[in-house]
């Protein structure tokens, strides 16, 4: 996994665990799936998941509001819902910005 702007997938994470931890590919895949499932289950229950030196995943409630259809301009009600938010830790922010370079942007 390099900083080339590539999208990292579950398969990439499983391969990294396989390479760095020494578990079999099957065990690595099961490990990654278990961690992701645990994070998902906690978020579904409305719990905050805090990973030290990485960041926090949390669920926030958004109330009902009035939005606008961009094509027609008509107002439409947007129902209340829950959204997931990720807040990076200060350590992660520092590591990302350590070189002072801007993050790569997606261009067409």
Curated annotation (Swiss-Prot):
Gene3D superfamilies: IHF-like DNA-binding proteins. GO terms for cellular component: cytosol. Belongs to the bacterial histone-like protein family. This is Integration host factor subunit alpha. This protein is one of the two subunits of integration host factor, a specific DNA-binding protein that functions in genetic recombination as well as in transcriptional and translational control. Heterodimer of an alpha and a beta chain. It comes from Rhodopseudomonas palustris (strain BisB18). Keywords: DNA recombination, DNA-binding, Transcription, Transcription regulation, Translation regulation. GO terms for biological process: DNA recombination; positive regulation of metabolic process; regulation of DNA-templated transcription; regulation of translation. GO terms for molecular function: DNA binding; structural constituent of chromatin.
């Amino acid at each position: 996994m390099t900083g080339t702007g590539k999208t990292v997938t579950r398969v990439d994470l499983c391969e990294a665990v396989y390479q760095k931890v020494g578990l079999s590919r099957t065990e690595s895949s099961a490990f990654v799936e278990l961690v992701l499932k645990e994070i998902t289950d906690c978020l579904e229950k409305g719990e905050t998941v805090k990973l030290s030196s990485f960041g926090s995943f949390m669920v926030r409630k958004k109330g009902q509001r009035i939005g606008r259809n961009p094509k027609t301009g008509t107002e439409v009600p947007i129902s209340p819902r829950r959204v997931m938010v990720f807040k990076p830790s200060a350590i992660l922010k520092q590591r990302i910005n350590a070189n002072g370079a801007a993050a790569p942007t997606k261009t067409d």
